[in-house]
Amino acid sequence: MEDVCTECGFDQSSTPAADVGPALERTATEVADAVRSVPLELLRRRPEPRTWAPIEYLGHLRESMAFHRWLIEQAVAQDHPEVPMVDPDESVAAADYRGADVEDLLGQFHRRVMRLGAHLAALPPGAAACSLTLGDRPITVALIARSAWHECHHHLGDIRRPGGL
């Protein structure tokens, strides 16, 4: 989780957590449109063995939205909890998203984005400054919120690339 991504150019480091929800929802709509635009023959195909297929990026984003909301809940409910780092490659491989129904995944992704947005809108005053340690790195709720937005923005480019969109 970084405030600025040199790979995709994302920099919303000055965006308050309360403003992330609506922006995240707009970006998630772009993700859904991009997934639906990928030709079916490319949707489940990995362009390279270590590069996810577009449907795997969607599955990862579905997981990621729930994980970000859970992180925020932990940071607000506990006094600086410690959370182990997760390996997204392992979770994507275990989930076998290439065999999943794309419309089911899109629906789940949409619901998780909406839940995260609602959760961000309902944060009590001062909650954006609450923090936790992810792996060995302390992060705030504000950074976690922006990271969810970044995940969607960044992987939107990944989804568009294989389909030539």
Predicted feature descriptions by range:
Residues 1-26:
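Terminal targeting/low-complexity segments that flank the catalytic cores of oxidoreductases
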Residues 37-42, 121-129, 164-165:
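Surface-exposed helix-capping loop/turn segments at secondary-structure junctions
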Residues 17-28, 51-58, 99-106, 141-145:
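Amphipathic, non-membrane alpha-helical segments in soluble helical-bundle scaffolds
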Residues 23-27, 32, 90-129, 148:
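Acidic/histidine-rich alpha-helical segments that form the ligand environment
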Residues 26-52:
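A glycine-rich, hydrophobic loop/mini-helix early in the fold
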Residues 1-2, 44-88, 129-165:
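Short, contiguous alpha-helical
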Residues 21, 32, 55-58, 62, ...:
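Non-transmembrane alpha-helical segments in soluble domains
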